[in-house]
Amino acid sequence: MFGLKDKVVLVTGGNRGIGAAIVGKLEKHGAQVAYTYRSDPGANGKLPIRADVTNLAEMDAAVQQVEEELGPIYGVVANAGITNDTLLSRMNPEQWESVISTNLNGAFNSIRPVAPLMYERKEGCFIFISSVVGEQGNIGQVNYSATKAGLIGMAKTLGLEGARYGVRANVVSPGFTETDMVRTIPDKVKEKILKTIPLRRFATEEEIAWGVVYLMSPVTGGYITGATLSINGGRHT
C-alpha cells in the first residue's frame, strides 16, 4: 500500500518513545529498519546499532554498517533528541550546547554520510522530527525550540537541494504526545496544557509514527518535499 516493502530506513533514537513507534510502524509496512541507540536497544527493528548522533565518525560507521548488512538506504528519520530546560536568564552554556549538539548537530551528522549516496542513486527521503515548540516557542525551552525550528529550516533547504536528485526532505512536527516524559508531568499542569489543545487530548506515539510513514512513502508522499506535517491536535496551525 505504501510502497515501503524492503526499503531500508535508518531511524536515530529508535529504541524508545516516538522513535520506537516509528521503527515498529515502518516495519509493519515492509521496511527493513535499522536504528541507533545510546544505552539499551529496543524491541523492534532489524538492525540496532549503538551510536551517538553527536559523533560524526560513529554515524558514518553506522551508515556503512546499514548499507553493508541491509542494503542501500532509502530513508533516514532524524529523531534523536534531548531536552535541558530552564529560562534563558538561568541557562548555562553547557545546557545550551548539549541540546544543540544532539538535536541539531546530531541531525546533520545523521544525514551527511547518507546524502551523497542517495543523490547518486537518485531516490530517497529525509524526515526530521521537530516539535510544536519549534513552531510556536515555549517558556523555558529556548535551546530546544531553537533546534526544532532549525530542523524545519534544514528540511526546507534540503528539499530544494535534493529535488534535482529525486531526494525529498520533510518534517513531522508533533505536539504534546503520550511519552514517558509527558506522563511524568503533574496532573494540574497536564490540565492546563490540555486546555490549549482543541482536540483536548495528547497525541499517541503511533499517530506520530503514521505521519512518518505517510511522508516516507513514495506512494503517498512522493510529491511532498520541504513540507512540515504538524500533528498537534490544533494547538498551533
What are these regions (language model features)?
Residues N15-R16:
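Conserved glycine-rich cofactor-binding loop
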Residues H29-N44:
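Conserved glycine-rich Rossmann-like NAD(P)H-binding loop of the short-chain dehydrogenase/reductase
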Residues P116, L160-R164, G222:
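Alpha-helical segment proximal to the catalytic Tyr-Lys
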Residues L87-L88, N92-I100, V182, I193:
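Substrate-binding pocket helix/loop in short-chain dehydrogenase/reductase
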Residues S131:
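Residue(s) in the substrate-gating loop at a strand-loop-helix junction
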Residues E123, F202-I231, H236:
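C-terminal substrate-recognition "lid" of short-chain dehydrogenase/reductases
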Residues I111, T147, A155:
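Active-site helix of classical SDR
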